Structures are given as structure tokens and as C-alpha cells.
Amino acid sequence: MIDFLTENDIVHINERTARAHGGKFEPPTNYLHEEALVYLVEAAGSEVFGAPMYPSPSDKAAHYMFSIISNHVFQDGNKRTGLQAARTFVQLNGGAFHKKLKAVEVDGRRVPSEGKGTKDIWFYLTMEMAAGAVSLEETREWFKRNTSW
């Protein structure tokens, strides 16, 4: 059984990251686009024509990260929140990230385009996602190849 993140879980992650890293948090929720959060939480477990929108746990983790970052759910801290939400989802569901994260080739393109070593890979993946340079499909492939379940 999959443990999904709730709206409250994600708001709490945003609040924790804002307090830990000096970001802005406007109580009670810090929303910029509440409807985007409602949709992403619902979509994580949804089906289309009887098939899951995000069939694997790695697809779901990618969805959380990509949707929070690209849809600017919060007034501040979307990159940190998206990253931490994905990491939390993986951990909650018994998955793990590989000790040494790597860039992956997707349709002849390196994702992320820069970075060596785990810290750099996280940084560039997150920044490129925020800049619109990484698609959801590329994010899904990256998570598939960098997680174990």
C-alpha cells in the first residue's frame, strides 16, 4: 500500500524548510496557488481510463517534486519543498535514493545538464526544473534510475 503525502504534509514541509533556511512563510499555509497543491495531491493517486497516472512509486515521487516546483504552489521555498516532498515520499514508502546520484540520458539529453556528485546533481536537477528546462517525463526517468524500491 502506498503512503501518499497530504496537503497538510506538504504545507508542513514548506513551513519546516522556510524556518530552517530563512525563507518566508505566511501562516497558516503560505499558498500562492492552492489549487495547484489540491490537484497534485489528488493526481498522485489518480487513474485515467483505469490506469494510474503515475504507476510506479518513482513516478509519484517525480510528480511531487516537479509539480510543487513548476507550479509555484507556495509564496516561497518551492524548490526546497518539492525536493523534500519527493525525498519524504520515497522514504515513507520504503524506497531509497542511490548513494551516488547520477545524471541520466533521456532522448539524447543529459538530465540534469550539469553536476558531478550527489550534492551537485540535486542542485542542478532542482534549478533546471525551476527554470523549466526539465520536463515531467525527464524527471520521471531520472527518479526511476536513481531510486531503489
Label each PLM-derived region with a short phrase.
Residues M1-W149:
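FIC/Doc superfamily catalytic core
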